Regions:
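C-terminal segment of classical bacterial N-terminal signal peptides
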Residues: 2-10
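Second-shell loop/turn segments in exported
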Residues: 22, 26-34, 57-63, 104-116, ...
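Short, contiguous alpha-helical
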Residues: 33-37, 44, 55-101, 137-174
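Acidic/histidine-rich alpha-helical segments that form the ligand environment
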Residues: 102-152
Length: 174
């Protein structure tokens, strides 16, 4: 091996391996649930705050192929329910269906009112939390992370909608 010496000596040192602060499934679950709570709070803040006159009408550049704020929020809710279902065991899914508590995707995606959107978004995140708590299997982490990434991606879209209209999103006010 060639000695790098001098200012590059650090490059030859073995990296220090540090233990992850997540030492158990419980720690991982808690960390994921915290991230889900964070994006839920931001999504609900927008669902409650986005101006009524733009809520289900504004589309960037008037493009009919682009979702309105209401449609984005309902899409987040529908996907949350879908992935909450995938986080559950088959037995848990069957019990949910039998109880009549599994909502229909078409019903979730139907715009009724701003308040209805807020209720659906909140309920969908509650379904995700419940699914994780009922089945905290770390093998399901891809679904957990999908909820976080998907919701955050659409949160970014919604922030852009605020900015496009000369408004400040609730998460940027202080």
């Amino acid at each position: 091996m060639v000695s790098l010496g001098g200012e590059f000596a650090w490059a030859q040192q073995s990296p220090t391996v540090t233990k992850s602060p997540l030492t158990s499934t419980s720690d991982l679950t808690i960390a994921v649930l915290k991230e889900i709570q964070d994006i839920e709070e931001r999504a609900v803040a927008i669902a409650e705050d986005f101006p009524d006159n733009l809520y289900n009408s504004y589309r960037p550049k008037g493009d009919q192929d682009v979702r309105t704020a209401a449609e984005i929020l309902l899409h987040i809710a529908e996907q949350n329910y879908s992935y909450a279902s995938l986080m559950r065991t088959k037995q848990q899914q069957e019990a949910l269906i039998a109880s009549g508590k599994k909502p229909d995707a078409k019903d979730i995606l139907t715009f009724v009112s701003k308040q209805d959107v807020v209720v659906k978004v909140k309920a969908s995140f509650a379904a995700v939390r419940e699914a994780i708590q009922d089945n905290p299997d770390p093998k399901k982490i891809e679904w957990w992370l999908y909820v976080i990434a998907h919701s955050n991606g659409h949160f970014g879209n919604l922030v852009t909608y605020y900015r496009d209209n000369g408004l400040v999103p609730p998460t940027s006010r202080q």
